[in-house]
Amino acid sequence: MTEEVHKLKITIFTDKGRSTISGGDFPLPVLPYPAPYTFRLFDYEIEGPNLTNKEFKVKTGKIEYKGEEFDIPSSSKGSWRGVDEEMDLIYVTIYPSRQPKKVFHY
């Protein structure tokens, strides 16, 4: 059975400006807060400053998935890191600073 692939888009504002990363998402379990959000994206695109293999602090941000928006609280931290260039695969991790107004779910 083939699982349906959905596009996931994450937009964050840091002291370096606006960065967006988007791509097809392999669903991973999302644990209740305070656990971090971890996304594994393939065939991804980056707009704005490339934050790959760097940690960042979020001023504001949001996650867009299946037509819904989920906020990323200010002062959250995160990183994205390249895993496999051959497969065009990257992991994005967001550590929410507090309970978001609308918690992300698949």
Swiss-Prot record:
Pfam families listed in its UniProt record: Dicty_CAD
Gene Ontology terms describing biological process: cell adhesion
InterPro entries: Dicty_CAD (IPR008601)
Family: Belongs to the csb family.
Official protein name in the record: Uncharacterized protein csb family protein DDB_G0271326
Annotated source species: Dictyostelium discoideum
